[in-house]
Amino acid sequence: MAQQAPDREKALELALAQIDKNFGKGSVMRLGEDVRPPIAVIPTGSIALDVALGIGGLPRGRVIEIYGPESSGKTTVALHAVANAQAAGGIAAFIDAEHALDPDYAKKLGVDTDALLVSQPDTGEQALEIADMLIRSGALDILVIDSVAALVPRAEIEGEMGDSHVGLQARLMSQALRKMTGALNNSGTTAIFINQLREKIGVMFGSPETTTGGKALKFYSSVRLDVRRIETLKDGTDAVGNRTRVKVVKNKVSPPFKQAEFDILYGKGISREGSLIDMGVEQGFIRKSGSWFTYDGEQLGQGKENARNFLLQNPDVGNEIEKKIKEKLGIGAQLTDDVADDALPAPVDF
């Protein structure tokens, strides 16, 4: 026969007391006990993408996957997140498995290359072990792994060129993510995995595209971003950048399937000012009449390029537009909860 209500409550309290004694206070809690603070985020560098993500940026303490075709802007998006984390006083690390990180380009995007921790590992096991140790230190704010496809298992590197190694990389990723996910949440570190596209053979219906490294990353990711180049930006006959579309194909912290478009300028990265102009027009703060852009009765310029230059020369106007957009849409970028003032998170036990 089922226990009476008072007996059940007493049994539960005894069990909770024993759990707290064995595993520490807070191991089990009622969901409504504490009002949870808003999710802390790291801005992406594009107001359009911050809005599409629904919370104002990439969530802290979560796994993020950025994938897309070659030269679509995946690493650029990741480096902008690194720059924004560093600007707020955070510590960043970059696992360069592709051995292709350009320090000069990273510096142009605002990354403090002197403070950036960089590793160029020899094997996938080494890369993920380094990443795991950095995360468990509790001192890291953002970690980028570029890319999953370049995380080659040790057995494949040491074997012959024609050897078959079925499922090795998928098993490696699955084991690593099982270990990392809890540590990421405890330390508040954002882990960005950059991934490449492959095509499945013999697919008759639906998209043949898939990402490397098995299915584990798809499951463990809180946010998945599909980055595509949709247009080449030209100044006369010279190509000066790309128009990029990012689709939020998975989002555990806000409604998914939203899209953002922004400009990536060669040698400069994401055009923050261009993104502000696009969102300002969309939200009604900037008026577009013909080719002229006007804000609050003041002409920004004729044509988007002139308006962009005006905002570059008058950053206060750009900041004001950004503030109004965020207030209207109810998003804000709480980055690192005042990293400089607060104590760093406690290291995670190995």
Curated annotation (Swiss-Prot):
Entries under PROSITE patterns matching the protein: RECA_1, RECA_2, RECA_3
Keywords for the protein's UniProt record, in alphabetical order: ATP-binding, Cytoplasm, DNA damage, DNA recombination, DNA repair, DNA-binding, Nucleotide-binding, SOS response
Paired cysteines (S-S): none
Sequence positions that bind ATP: G68, P69, E70, S71, S72, G73, K74, T75
SMART domains referenced in this protein's UniProt entry, alphabetically: AAA (SM00382)
GO biological process: DNA recombination; DNA repair; SOS response
Keyword presence, DNA damage: yes
GO cellular component: cytosol
One annotated GO molecular function: ATP-dependent DNA damage sensor activity
Major localisation: cytoplasm
Compartments where located: Cytoplasm
Keyword set includes Lipid metabolism: no
Family the entry assigns: Belongs to the RecA family.
Function field: Can catalyze the hydrolysis of ATP in the presence of single-stranded DNA, the ATP-dependent uptake of single-stranded DNA by duplex DNA, and the ATP-dependent hybridization of homologous single-stranded DNAs. It interacts with LexA causing its activation and leading to its autocatalytic cleavage.
PANTHER family in alphabetical order: MITOCHONDRIAL DNA REPAIR PROTEIN RECA HOMOLOG-RELATED, RECA
Cited NCBIfam families: tigrfam_recA
Record-given protein name: Protein RecA
Lineage: Bacteria, Bacillati, Actinomycetota, Actinomycetes, Mycobacteriales
